[in-house]
Each structure stands twice: as C-alpha cells, then as structure tokens.
Swiss-Prot record:
Biased composition (Basic residues): 1577-1586
Region (Tankyrase-binding): 1450-1542
Segments of this protein annotated with the region Acidic: 210-1572
Keyword Ribonucleoprotein: no
Modification sites for N6-methyllysine: 1644
Region (Disordered): 1-151, 184-450, 484-603, 657-880, 897-1083, 1240-1302, 1362-1561, 1575-1729
Taxonomic source organism: Homo sapiens
Record protein name field: 182 kDa tankyrase-1-binding protein
C-alpha cells in the first residue's frame, strides 16, 4: 500500500509532469519521444526486473498498475483523488490487489495470478524502487516509471496473459468489490469516468489494468508510453472489459498474455501500431474493435485476427512481443512512448499524432516488423476479442463498447483512450486531462453506455452507478480534460455532451449521441483523430460508416458506442495509424456495418469490429509510415476481413472503405489535425487524408502517405469517401461529382475540407483543418470555439453535431454515414447525390443526414432539432430535415441546397440538379430565383409562383437561412457551408425556424448569418463562379444565365457550396474574410453572391440589362464577389455593381447607369459599401446594387438591410457578419434571395419582388418572418405584406425597379412602397424581423408598415417575440421590426430594448434607421414622404444598403447626432429623422448605421461590443438582433473578429456619431472635467473630509455636483474638505480654512478655468500674505475669485461665510506660497478640523 502510495505519490508528482508531457507532448513528437525516452530508461530497469518474470512480473504487475496511477497520480486530481480515495486504495498495492486477488481468486492462471498477486505485492515492495525511481524518472520523463512498469507489464503479461484473462474474468467477479476498492482507490485515482462513477467503472477498468491493464495501464501510464500505451490502451480499454468481463479478461488475458508477456515491449511497440491500430481498432472499431474482437473475434476477428492471431498470435504475440519486447523495448520506449504514450495522451491529444505518426511512424517503423506482430497482437487481442465477443454475446453491449476498447488493438487504442480514460481521466481529474477527454468521451459514450449495456459488468456498472452518474462524472471530469486536453477545447464541449448526452439520451443519444457523441468524439476524436475518429470514434465512425446500422447498432450498442466516443477520443492516437485504420476500419466497419446495417446489433457490430480491428491494426500500423507494410499486411489481413464484409458488400465495403476510410482519413486529417491545431491540420490533414484515401485497405494504408492518393481517391471518389466527398460536396453544395478530384482530399479536403470541413468536420470537426481554415475564416476560436460556441450556442448537440456533424458529417456523412446511409442511398451517386440525394433524398436525406452521420442519428436525434441535422450536415441536413425535408433533397443534393432545392426544387428540382446543389439553395432561392431568373423574369413569375413555395421554400429556405443560418450558423459547416447557411440555414430554419429559427436564428441566424452566410460561400460566392470552380462548375451547371444565375448561384451555391469552399478558396482568400469577409464578404460575398445572385437573378430577372448588369453585377459581383468577398471590393466593386444596380441601376435598369450609379453607389455605397459594403456591398451592395439596381432602396433595403442587415441584419442578420451574415445570409438569403428576389422582383418587376419580396419577403419574412411568419406567422404581414409589399413591391418593384432607380422618389417612393419591399427588404433588412419588421414597417412601409406595422407591431409582438426567439428574427424584427415598429412605438419599444439597447443600438439606429426608417421613415415618412422617405428609406435603405442615401449625410449626421441625442427620442427622432433625415441618418447610419448600427447596436450588443466597436456595426447589428445578437454576438465572437475585420472593411466600422450615437451613454461622461474634479476631489476628499455644506454643495455642485453631493453629506459640517479638490477656491469663501485649503489646492488643482495656477497663487498669495487684511482681502479676493472663479463665486455666495472664514483659511493656509498655503491650509484644517 505504501509502495503504491509512494508510487502514486511519485506517480502523481512525477507522472503528472509526465502527463503534462503527454498532454503537451502529444501535440508534437515529444509525446512519443519524451515518453519513449523515459520509458526506455525504466524499461531497462524493468528489463532487469523482467528476467524474473514470474516473481517480478507479479511485482511488476502491481508496479505496472501503479504507474498508471502514477500518471493519474500525476494528475493533480490523482493526488486529490488519492487524498479523497486514499493513497492506499489508490496505491498500487490496493489497486493491484483488487486485481491480484481477483487473479488469485481466479485460479485460471492461479499460479500466474498468485504470482501476479505476488508480483503486485512484490511490486508493491519492489515498485517503490521502480515506481519511485520510475516516478522520479517520471518527473523528468514521466513515462520512465511506466517504462519499467510496462516491462513489468510485459513480463507480467507474458506470464499472465492467461492469468490476466482469468484475472480479468475474475476481476469481473471481483469487480464488484474491486471496483469498490477501485472506487475508493482507483476511483479517485482513476478518474476514468470522472472518478467515482465512471472512474469506478474505469476503476473497474483499472482492475484489469491493475493486474494486466493496470500494470499495463500503470506501466502504460508510467511506462505505458513505452510499452503499455498500446497494451494499456488495449488493456485499459480492455481493463474495463477485463474487469468487466471474463471475456474481456480472456480477451485481455489473451491480450494481456501477449501484452503482459511480450506486450510490454511488443505491445509497447506493436501496440503502437496496435495502439494506433488499437486506437484504430478502438477508434475505427474502437467500439467495433472491441466487438470486432468480441464479435469480430467470431466474425471479423476470427476470420482475421482470432484464427490467425488468437492462438498463433497469442503465442506469436507473446513470442513476437518478447522479441518485440526487445525490439519494442527500445522502440516501444520510443514508439510506445511516443505513439503509445502519445497515443494515450494523444488519445486525448494525439492529434499531434499526425506528427506522431511521423514519430509514431518512425517509431512504428521500428515496430514495423513488430507491427505485423502488433497486428498479431491485435490478433492476439482479437482472440481476446473473441472473449469480448462473448461479452457481446454476454449481452455486454457496453462490453462491446468496452470490448471495443477492449479489442486487443482496440483495447490498445481503447487503452489509449480508455486507458487515457482511466489514466487520462484520472489525469484530467488530476488536472492533466489528456485522454480523459477522449476517454471520457469514449467513456462518456462508453461508460455512460457501458453501464447500460454492461449489465454483466456489475462492478463496472456499479462503479458507474448509472450511465447518468458516469456521464455526470464524466462530464465533470470532462470539464477537467476539456481544457487541458490537446483536444481539451474540443473535449470541453465534446466530452461533456457525450456523458450527458449519452447518459441522458443513452439510447437516443446512443444513436444520436453516438452520432453526436461519436461525432463529437469524432469532432474530438475524429478531429483529433480523423480516421481514428471513424475507427477510433467508432461511434462516430460507426455512426459514419454504420450510421444507419451503427447509429442504430450503437443505439442498441450505442450505449456501448458512447464508449466508442470514449474510444474515439482514443482514436486520436489512432490518428497516427487511424488514417489507414479508418480506412480498413471503415472498410471493415463498413463491411461489418453493411451486414451490420441490417443487423444493427453489437454482434454484427462486433463482426464489423472484428474485421475492423483486424483492419485497424493495419490502420494503426498505417498510422506510422513504417507500419505501412504492416498496414499492408494488415490491410491484407483486413482485406480478407474486408473481403468477408466485402463479400457481404463488396461495393459498399469498397465504397465504405474508400469513402469511410478516406472520410476517416479526412476526418483523421480533420480530426487528427484538430487537436494539434490548425498548423498541424493542413499537413496532417493532407497526410492523413492521403493516408486513408488509398482505399486498397492495406494498399490504401500502405499508401497511408499517399495524401495524393487520398486526394486522388477522394478525387476519384475512391470508395465512399470520394462519394462522400462528393456527397459532402453535394451536401455542402460542393459539386463534388466533377469536383471530387478537385474537392477530393486535396481540393475538396483542403478546399472543401476547409470549406466543408473538412468543412464541417473541419469547421467543427477539424478546426485544425477545415475548422482551422474555417476557423481562420471565422477565426480559430470561431472555428473551434465558434463552432463550439455556436454549437454551444446552438447547443451541445450542435457542437457535437458540429464536431460530429462537421466531422461525422464530413466523415461519417461523407464516407461513413454516407456510405452506410448513402450506401443505402447508393451514395456513390452522392455526387449525383444531388439527384441521388434528391431522389434518395429521403432515404439519403435521412441517410444523408444519417450519412452525414449526424444527420440520421443526429437527425433522428436532432432531427427535429435541425441542430443535429443541420448540425450534422447536418446543419442543414437537420434543417434539411426540417426544412430540408423539402429542402432536404435540395440540401441533400446540395446537401442543403439540393435538399432545399429538392423541396423547392420540387419546382426547381431539375434546376437544382441543373443548378446542382446550390441550385438547391440557389434553386431554392435561385430556384425560384433561378427559375425566375432562369426564366429570367418569367421565372420571376415562377418565382412569383414559387414565392409561396419560395416564400416557404425561400422563407423556409431563407428562414432556413436565417434559422438555417442559425443552423448553418449552428453548424460550423453551416457556416462553413454557407450553403447550409443558405440551404441549411433556412432549411432547419424553416423547420426550426419556427422555434429554432428564433433560437437557431439566434445561433443559426447569427451563425448562419455570419457563418453560413458569410462563411458560406459568400466568399465562395465571392469566388462565385469566378473563384470557385464548383460554383463556376455550377455555372456551367447553371449555364450562362445560369452562369449568371450560376454566377450568383455559384455565388450562392458556390458561396454556399462552392462558396463555402470558395470561401475556403475565395474565402480562403479571406479566411478571416471568409468569416468576416464571409460575413462581410459573406455578406458581400454572400450578397456578392447574392449580388451575383441577384445580379444574375436580376439577370435572370432582367435578362437584358440585368444580365448585363447582372453580368456586371454578376461578374462584377463575382469579381466583387471576390473583390468584395475577397477584398470587400464588392463593397467597392460590388458596391459599384450594387450601386450599379442600385445606384441608379434603377435596379440595374441601366447597367451603365448601374455602373455609374454603381460608382455613385459604390461611392455612396462604397462608403457605406465599405460598411454597407458588407451590407450593401455585400448583399446590399450586391443586392443593394441589385437593389440599387432597382433596389438601391433595396440596396438600401437590402443594402440597408445589408447594412441594416448588416446592421439591422444583425437583427435579422443575426447580424452576424454583420448581421448580414444572417441578414446577409438571412438577408442575403432573405434579402438576397428576397432582396434578390426583391431586387429581381423589384427590379424584375417588383411584382416578382413583391412576390418574392412579398412572398420572398414573406418568404423572407417567412424566413425571418418564418419566425415572423411564424411569429406573426403572418403570412399576413408577409402575405399581407407580400401583397402589400408585393403589390407595392411589385408595382414599386417595377417602379422601383426603374424608378427605384433608386432613387427613391420614383419607384423608390414606390420602392418605398417597394421599399416597403425594400423596407420589406429593409424589413428584410432586419432580416427576419427586419424582413418582417422592416417589412412590416418597411414594406409597405407605410402600408406594410401599417400592414405590417400592425403586423409589425403585432409582429413585434411576434417579432418581439421573434426578437425574443427570433431575436434574430425578432431582434431583427424587433430591431428592424422593432425599429420598424420601433418606429412604431411598439416596435420601437421592442426595438427600444434593442434600440434601447442602443436604440436598437444602432441597429435600431441602423435597423431602426432601417426599421425606423422603414417604420418611421419608410413607414411614417413613407406615407408622408414616400419618395423622400422611400428615398430616405431608400436612402436609408441605401444608407444601409444604399450608401447612396449616405450621400445625404447632412441630415444623416444631424440625424445621427439627433439619433445620438435622441437616444430615447432616437427612435422617434429617428422616425422623424427617418422621415426627414432618416435617409441622411440612415445614410450616415448607412455608413454609420453600419457603424451606428454597429455602434448603436454596440451598446445593446455588449457582447459584440467588445469587438464590436469597429466591426460591431455589424456586431451592432448582431446586437440588433437581440437573441440573434447574443448568438450573433456569440458567433460574432466567433465571427465577430472576422466580422470585425469585415465590419471595419465595411466602412466606418462605427462612426463617431454612430459610436457616440451608439454610446450615447457616454454623454454623461462628457463632464470629464467634472469627473476629473471628482477624481481630484476624491483624492483630496480624503484630506478634506469636512466640507462646508453650502460651499461644498454650491461650489461642488457647480464644479462637481456629484462631488458636492458626495462630500456635502459626508463633510456637511466641514466645509473645507469636499470641495478642496475641485472647488478649493470655491471653498475659500466658505472658510479661510476651506478657502485657503481650497485656494491652495486650487493652485495645485487649477481646477477653475477662471484661475490659472498662477492666478490662484497670485490671489491666494495675496490672501496668504495678508493674513488679517488677507481675511478681508481674502474674502474679497475670494469673492473676486468667486467672481473670477466660477466655483468660488458660486460657492462664495452660497457659503456666505467667505468673509469670516476666509481669514481663517488665509491664516491657516499660511502666508507663504501656495505650497505653504496648502500645507498650512492642511495643517490648519487638521488643527481646526
């Protein structure tokens, strides 16, 4: 016990650093090196000890187990837990004892067990030297201790494999007591399941670990990195199972034998591959690995591992491990230490594993020869897998899960994760939380699930208590690991959901949670481990590969599966080998799953896993470069395994294998890089992507280094991944079919990966990769944090969905699920998935969602939740499901678009196809728009016809947009997607929009806004057909007009799909830009895209001029798309277009004019276009240009909305990239679509616009108003509005179109009506709320306003409510709407909160300007001054959208100032202003609204304000959308920075007026002098406590009223003190003392302007000089000074004492200089006072 305690203490002290090393090291090669080195040293120790295998191994067994404690002990929590649990139970003695007695009790290897017990005891005695030395060594190299222990484990394992099996079986028996003991000792120490619940489970897990696993685990933990990491992983993973099951024991015994006997070195070494492979096994079949070994033992493992390796490999492994122990002794020291040690920690943070695979590869290469042996050890494990298979048979579903970790390699890997779970969980409990996250994720999923399915593991169950308990404990622990883990950030979000989700939603979450958790783990694991994610995050991978089956299987087995997540975390190590592993695993898993798909049972799962583990070793070995041979060997072996499954589903397998492997590879890249971080991500992604893509299984693994292969295979759509990529492309609107090559790992992976995430995965799943990119776009924080943030925002599910979705989606969805589900759908058609999706949309939609992994499960799980759906592809698949159902095919097609398109596309289905994905969205938007546009204007009619659908679709779509934006926003991918933002955004938005739109809109909108929209492909759109081939490809898709459409569609789709990628590409151009730029760009780009979209749309709408302009618009928009998107040129360039269009493009009535106007508008809008550029420039610009083209008002409306949207949009835009993100998206969607439509409609004829607007707007409204629609539901306001607006819009649209010419007066007035439309747009501007609100106010503005005004008001009840829930919507509405209604007092009020927030904080201002403008301006003035107001509104609209309105800044500034001044009145004033100067105001606000809005919103939007100051015009907008704003703010935070860039780009980020206006609050501070005085007073106040109340009051009141008040009461009796600082002179009159003090201080203070220090001194000196006379003179001078000094004069009269008192102070002060005066004054004061 003492020894154990010592060891633990040492381990805790020493291993903690070790763990730190692990934690830190896993990031680089160090984990392996550092670990390897220290373990190597201990290993010799162990090796000397090793000779006495019987005795010392027994001793070493305890020692071995102790080291794991050491690592755990390393953790602060371990120590803490030691205290809590007690070092003794914690000590190797007690911990091993539970196992030793069990092995002893378990007479299977009675001698061995006894020996082992003896070993433990001997080890207890012996370990003190070893352990303390090891631990001592451990501090330097924490793994040193583990090395000896590991060799101990090796020795022990060699002798005690059977023993271990028996012991493991016995531990199961003893698990109850042992776990209790473990609970006491290991619980705290373990911290596996967060300690007592899970830890006990892992305490249970630790039991075998103690014997074998603990030796391995401890050895692994301490020396584990050298030897035991794999073994420990296996055994640790096994450990739960070993403890849990005799089968596990047997399995682990098998493994432990091989591992214990030879595993120490061999496992250490082979297990590195094994660890990677185990990680893979654990990762790929991590869950499957166990079942693979359990069930796989029978089905997969038997045919692969069990027969070949169970017996032979057992001996062979023992033998091989013995030799390998020698080989691995050095190599494992390094390899295990690095890969294994790194894997353990890397399990958590082995994302460095990508680097470590380099290390691991070198290290694994050493095991290269051993890796085959490792494979055999795998096989060895797989014979144990046979035991786990009984586990499965035993009904140990969890044991399957556990078995998954338990799977030899899986267990090695599981031990990497599970062990990290025990170890790392303990570590995280101890503060160093490396793997715990993963492990806990696994455990979270696994343990939470384990207790569920782990009925036979009573001890485990008991330790777990309930799933929930474990989950909670996990959650708690996860909280620990979350931060520390390399994946800590991920873990933070990801792990807790797993436990929580898994536990709470064990069954549901088993399915969805597996997807989510697995996905999350995939996000973590998968991201951390990419491939390992699929294999490792077998839950994820299963969710991916087996999503239907595994999702279901893991529903049944999913509880076990959550362990997969736990294991999937572990696959992070697998990331080394996981690429290959996932491939094989994907292959195998897919194979298994294929059969399993039908059988969704643990056994089939196991079968899958059996094959997978077999494959996984290869994968694990593939992790290292050297293991490529082993990988090939295993690939061959797994290939047989694969062959079996392949036989089952050769094609599916191949596809699954290819796709899943590649997906996993991508995920691996995506996942793997994630922990390492973005920097490693790309390389890692490439490497990993390259590695898995070779779908040849072994060949692919062999080609593990074939990034090109991966890309090429992906490009080739090798297997499912290719399809998956295509699918992802489709899903993401990435036309992957043609592009798989481009998109493929390299293009797609990098582009799409980044774009989609590798996009989704990347965005969420692999911030390192796509997310990093995406994060770069969005900001890494945004990528990961943002993703998480919005995921969190969206909900954990989202995050997990995001992780899962992004990743699972990307990976699972793409390959795994796609494979699994798409397999169902025939996802190969996935490119065709657009169609296939479309056709299979339902199957595939679900499947896709399922495919998207996150989709199905999550879809199922989150299906309503659009979070998952949306999230997964999630985001929009989710949305897709919601909206996606109609949009689903679209979105599926596009993933989101096609789905959407599918729905909308029903109408525009062909188009969507034709359009392809983005046609979905585009087709949705573009569909009708396209249709409209396609038909040109005729399509408008179509669009008009579609409006209902569009309205629905668009609304839904846009809503989806908004909400979908939310969703999209929700999904990093969504953001990433942009398409999703478009499609997804609103797909769910539509679905979720209603409830989620608000909430999602907040997240979604904001995210959608900024993320999806901005992210989406706005940049992509920027890339728009130009930048992005897919878009452009779609352009061809769309053909020319389509090209224009496609251009914008491209822009749209591209932006969404391609744009997403383009955003990656173009967006990549401006990653930040992508985020921000995407927001801005996205807005711009989006709008640019929409600009493009609009342009082309307009082009479609106006084939002639519009096409020209559209071309101008499109092209320019395109270039603007990139300019704008890229540079924000859109603002300028795009603005030009926008202006072009908007500017008097009359709605691009005159393209030339448009250009001219464009320039004007560019100038105007350019100004604002900088700001509005996002707004206008972005959508406004584009759309403003489009709008300007007929929608300057629209630009105003849109731009306005853009600005407003940007600003207002914040409201609608979730303001995100400026609210435009949402607004952009939303707005772009809405506005864009709507605006587009509006622009088109308005331009196209207003009717279309009306329809579009009305419908579209309604749609838009519907979208936002989806909230609104839903909110006000209002189809009324919408419909009403639509009619009103539609009519108005229509007519005005027409008028506006031409007359709108923007300018206002004419059609603008109309367009005011149009503006109603525009307002509608402006209304839209608020996005949803804006749409509605603005619409309400804006749209008919007066009518609509009235129409909507009531509705707006009503809406505002709703919008308010919308704002509440729409926040984005309502916020929009409220702000916009509020603004509108805000204009309308209700709205204003509502807006006032917003506005009050700062007048809508600028949004109100801006949106208010918008809304108010609309409402007021447009609404009120609109009727009053339709032309002007419209103009104003337009101006206003222009102001936001239409910076042209900005040109009239005079009013605008005045207004702004007025606004500023009339903070309260602001709304009213604004209303008035809006009516009169609103245009100017707006204009200024346009510039300033973006800024003011930003600023204005800024106050309201405190969160964003931080970064919002500049960009927060948008943030402001974001703020505008209260909820949205919050989300937006959150996302702003995510994207805020990017957006910040964007906003700044956007023009005056915040105008001074805007800011001041925003920060009217500062007015109080205007008295800084007063405050200074106050400060002085405060300073001197201490001296002059006594203040003459009158003087103090008067003088201070005057000089510093606050001070006077402050001091008055306190120093009321004393007149001298309070005023002294500020009003020293003032107080002179009060009393000489006071006066002198004051005078003296007055000299010092120079408080009074009247008196300079010299004057005061001169006056004071005379006073000082004339003491007596001075008294009179002083009184006089005081009076004079009072006259001279305001303070004095005021105070003298007030005091009335001056005559009498002054002499005193005079004398008191002293007659010398000011210095003596004040000194004397002080003295006298003191004396007299």
């Amino acid at each position: 016990m003492k020894v154990s305690t010592l060891r633990e203490s040492s381990a805790m002290a020493s291993p903690l650093p070790r763990e730190m090393e692990e934690e830190l090291v896993p990031t680089g090669s160090e984990p392996g090196d550092t670990r390897a080195k220290p373990p190597v040293k201990p290993k010799p120790r162990a090796l000397p000890a090793k000779p006495a295998l019987p005795a010392k191994p027994s001793l070493l067994v305890p020692v071995g187990p102790r080291p794991p404690r050491g690592p755990l002990a390393e953790l602060p929590s371990a120590r803490k837990m030691n205290m809590l649990a007690g070092p003794q139970p914690y000590g190797g003695s007690k911990r091993p004892l539970p196992f030793a007695p069990r092995p002893a009790v378990e007479a299977s290897t009675g001698g061995e067990a006894t020996q082992e017990t003896g070993k433990e005891e001997a080890g207890k005695e012996e370990p003190p030297p070893l352990t303390p030395p090891a631990r001592c060594a451990a501090p330097g190299g924490v793994r040193k201790a583990p090395a000896p222990f590991r060799p101990a484990s090796e020795r022990f394992a060699a002798t005690t494999v059977e023993e271990i099996l028996a012991k493991m079986e016995q531990p199961r028996k003893e698990v109850l007591a042992s776990p209790d003991r473990l609970w006491g000792s290991r619980l705290t120490f373990n911290h596996d399941g967060s300690s007592r619940y899970g830890p006990r489970t892992y305490g249970t897990t630790t039991a075998p670990r103690d014997e074998d696993g603990s030796t391995l685990f401890r050895g692994w933990s301490q020396e584990g990195p050298v030897k035991s990491p794999a073994e420990c992983r296996e055994e640790h993973s096994k450990t739960p199972e070993e403890r849990s099951l005799p089968s596990d024991l047997a399995f682990n015994g098998d493994l432990a034998k091989a591992a214990s006997s030879e595993l120490p070195a061999d496992i250490s070494k082979p297990w590195i591959p094994s660890s990677p492979a185990p990680s893979s096994e654990n990762g790929g079949p991590a869950s499957p690995g166990l079942p693979a070994e359990a069930s796989g033992s029978g089905p997969g493992s038997p045919h692969l591992h069990p027969p070949d390796k169970s017996s032979p490999c057992h001996s062979q492994l023992l033998e091989a491990q013995t030799p390998e122990a020698s080989q691995a002794s050095p190599c494992p020291a390094v390899t295990p230490s690095a890969p294994s040690a790194a894997l353990p920690d890397e399990g958590s943070r082995h994302t460095p594993s990508p680097g470590l695979p380099a290390e691991g590869a070198p290290e694994a290469p050493r095991p290269s020869s051993p890796p085959p042996e490792v494979l055999e050890p795998h096989s060895l494990d797989q014979p144990p897998a046979t035991s786990p298979r009984p586990l499965i048979e035993v009904g140990e579903l969890l044991d399957l899960t556990r078995t998954f970790p338990s799977g030899g390699e899986e267990e090695a890997k599981g031990d990497a994760h599970l062990r990290p779970t025990s170890l790392v969980q303990r570590r995280f409990s101890e503060g160093v939380l490396q793997s715990p996250s993963q492990d806990q994720e696994k455990l979270g999923g696994s343990l939470a699930a384990l207790p569920q399915g782990q009925g036979s593991q009573l001890a485990l169950d008991r330790p777990f208590g309930a799933e929930s308990n474990w989950s909670l404990s996990q959650s708690f622990e996860w909280t620990f690991p979350t931060r520390p883990s390399g994946l800590g950030v991920w873990r933070l979000d990801s792990p807790p959901p797993s436990p929580i989700t898994e536990a709470s939603e064990a069954a549901e979450a088993a399915e969805a949670g597996n997807l989510a958790v697995s996905s999350r783990e995939e996000g973590v694991s998968q991201q951390g481990q990419g491939a390992g994610s699929a294999p490792s995050g077998s839950g994820s991978s299963w969710v991916q590969g087996d999503d239907p089956s595994m999702s279901l299987t893991q529903k049944g087995d999913g509880e076990s599966q959550p362990q997969f997540p736990a294991v999937p975390l572990e696959p992070l190590p697998t990331t080394e080998g996981t690429p290959g592993l996932p491939l094989q695993q994907a292959e195998e898993r897919y194979e298994s799953q294929e059969p399993l798909a039908g059988q969704e049972s643990p056994l089939p799962l196991a079968t899958r896993e059996a094959a997978l583990p077999i494959l996984e070793p290869v994968l694990g070995q593939e992790q290292p470069a050297a293991p490529d041979q082993p990988c090939v060997l295993f690939a061959d072996a797994p290939e047989p395994g694969q062959a079996l499954p392949v036989e089952e589903e050769a094609v599916t397998l191949a596809r699954a294998e290819t796709t899943q492997a590649r997906t996993e590879a991508q995920d691996l890249c995506r996942a793997s890089p994630e922990p390492p971080g973005p920097e490693s991500s790309s390389r890692w992604l490439d490497d990993l992507l390259a590695s898995p893509p070779p779908s040849g299984g072994g060949a692919r693994r062999g080609a593990g280094a074939e990034l090109k292969d991966t890309q090429s295979p992906s490009t080739c759509s090798e297997g499912l991944l290719g399809w998956s990529q295509k699918d992802l492309q489709s899903e993401f609107g990435i036309t992957g079919d043609p592009q798989p090559s481009s998109f493929s790992p390299s293009s797609w992976c990098q582009g799409a990966s980044q774009d989609y995430g590798l996009g989704g995965a990347s965005p969420r799943g692999d911030p390192g990769l796509g997310e990093r990119d995406w994060t770069s776009k969005y900001g890494q924080g945004a990528g990961e944090g943002s993703t998480r943030e919005w995921a969190s925002r969206c909900g954990i599910g989202q995050e997990e969905m995001e992780a899962s979705s992004s990743q699972d989606q990307s990976k699972v969805s793409a390959p795994g699920v796609l494979t699994a589900q798409d397999r169902v759908v025939g996802k190969p058609a996935q490119l065709g998935t657009q169609r296939s999706q479309e056709a299979d949309v339902q199957d595939w939609e679900f499947r896709k969602r399922d495919s998207q992994g996150t989709y199905s499960s999550r879809d199922a799980e989150l299906q309503d939740q659009e979070f998952g759906k949306r999230d997964s592809l999630g985001t929009y698949s989710s949305r897709d499901v919601s909206l996606g159902d109609w949009e689903f095919g679209k979105r599926d097609s596009l993933g989101a678009y096609a789905s959407q398109d599918a729905n909308e596309q029903g109408q525009d289905l062909g188009k969507r196809d034709h359009h392809g994905r983005y046609s979905s969205q585009d087709a949705d938007e573009q569909d009708w728009e396209f249709q409209k546009r396609d038909v040109s204007l005729g399509t408008y009619g179509s669009r008009a016809a579609e409006p209902q659908e569009q309205e629905f679709g668009k609304s839904a779509w846009i809503r989806d947009y908004s909400s979908g934006g939310s969703s999209r926003t929700l999904d990093a991918q969504d953001r990433s997607f942009g398409t999703r933002p478009l499609s997804s955004g609103f797909s769910p938005e539509e679905a979720q929009q209603q409830d989620e739109e608000f909430e999602k809109k907040i997240p979604s909108v904001e995210d959608s806004l900024g993320e999806g929209s901005r992210d989406a492909g706005r940049p992509g759109e920027r890339g728009s057909g130009g930048l992005f081939s897919p878009s452009t490809a779609h352009v061809p898709d769309g053909a020319l007009g389509q090209r224009d459409q496609s251009s914008w569609q491209n822009s749209d789709a591209s932006q969404e799909v391609g744009g997403h990628q383009e955003r990656q590409q173009a967006g990549a151009q401006g990653p930040g830009s992508a985020d921000l730029e995407d927001g801005e760009m996205g807005k711009r780009g989006w709008v640019g895209e929409f600009s493009l979209s609009v342009g082309p749309q307009r082009e479609a709408a106006f084939s002639p001029g519009q096409q020209d302009w559209s071309r101008d618009f499109c092209i320019e928009a395109s270039e603007r798309s990139y300019q704008f998107g890229i540079i924000g040129n859109d603002r300028v360039s795009g603005a030009g277009f926008s202006p072009s269009s908007k500017m008097e493009g009359g709605h691009f009535v005159p393209p030339g004019k448009t250009t001219a106007g464009s320039v004007d508008w560019t100038d105007q809008l350019g100004l604002r276009n900088l700001e509005v550029s996002s707004c206008v420039g972005s959508g406004g610009s584009s759309e403003a240009r489009e709008s300007a083209v007929g929608q300057m008002g629209w630009s105003g409306g849109l731009s306005l909305r853009d600005m407003n949207l940007t600003g207002c949009l914040e409201s609608g835009g979730s303001e995100e990239p400026g609210g435009i993100g949402v607004g952009e998206k939303d707005w772009t969607s809405d506005v864009n679509v709507k605006s587009k439509d509006l622009a088109e409609v308005g331009e196209g004829g207003g009717h279309s616009q009306a329809r579009e607007s009305g419908v579209g707007q309604t749609d838009w409204s519907g979208v936002e108003a989806g909230e609104f629609l839903k909110s006000r539901e209002r189809g009324v306001g919408q419909a009403d509005w639509t009619p009103d607006l539609g009519l108005r819009n229509m007519a005005p649209g027409a008028v506006c179109s031409p007359g709108e010419s923007k300018e206002l007066g004419v059609g603008q007035m109309d367009w005011g009506n149009n503006l109603g439309l525009r307002d509608l747009e402006v209304t839209c501007d608020p996005d949803s709320g804006g749409s509605q609100g603005l619409r309400g106010c804006g749209v008919g503005q007066m009518d609509w306003t009235q129409d909507l005004a009531p509705q707006n008001v009503e809406l505002f009840g709703a919008p308010s409510e919308a704002r509440e829930h729409g926040v984005g919507g309502v916020s929009q509405c409220p702000e916009p709407g509020l603004r509108h209604n805000g204009s309308l007092s209700p709205g204003l009020e509502a807006r006032d909160p917003l506005e009050a927030r700062e007048l809508g904080v600028g949004e109100t201002s801006g949106p208010e300007t918008q809304g108010e403008d609309y409402s007021s301006s447009s609404l009120e003035p609109h009727p009053a001054d339709p032309g002007m107001e419209t103009g104003e509104a337009l101006s206003f609209g222009a102001s936001p959208g239409r910076c042209p309105a900005r040109p009239p800044p005079s009013g605008s500034q005045g207004l702004l100032e007025e606004m500023l001044a009339a903070s309260s009145s602001k709304a009213v004033a604004r209303r008035e202003s809006a009516a009169s100067g609103l245009g100017g105001l707006l204009e200024e606000e346009g510039a300033g609204a973006g800024a003011a809005q930003e600023e204005v919103l800024e106050p309201g939007r405190d969160s964003p304000p931080s970064w919002r100051p500049q960009p927060d015009g948008e943030a402001s907008q974001t703020e505008d959308v209260d909820g949205t704003w919050g989300s937006s703010a959150a996302r702003w935070s995510d994207q805020g920075p990017a957006q910040t860039s964007r906003r700044p780009s956007q023009g005056p980020p915040a105008r001074s007026p805007s800011q001041d206006f925003s920060f009217i609050e500062d007015t109080e501070i205007l008295d800084s002098a007063m405050y200074r005085s106050r400060a002085n007073l405060g300073r001197k106040r201490g001296h002059r406590a006594p203040v003459i109340r009158p003087g103090g009051t008067l003088g201070l009141s005057e000089a510093a009223d606050s001070d006077a008040h402050l001091f008055q009461d306190s120093t009321e009796p004393r007149a001298s003190r309070v005023p002294s600082s500020d009003e020293e002179v003032v107080e002179e009159p009060q009393s000489r003392r006071t006066r002198m003090s004051l005078g003296t201080k007055g000299l010092k203070v120079n408080l009074f302007p009247g008196l300079s220090p010299s004057a005061l001194k001169a006056k004071l000196r005379p006073r000082n000089r004339s003491a007596e006379e001075g008294e009179l003179a002083e009184s006089k001078s005081s009076q004079k000074e009072s006259a001279v000094q305001r303070s004095k004069s005021c105070k003298v009269p007030g005091l009335g004492k001056p005559l009498t008192l002054p002499p005193k102070p005079e004398k008191s002060s002293g007659s010398e200089g000011s210095s003596p005066n004040w000194l004397q004054a002080l003295k006298l004061k003191k004396k007299k006072v």
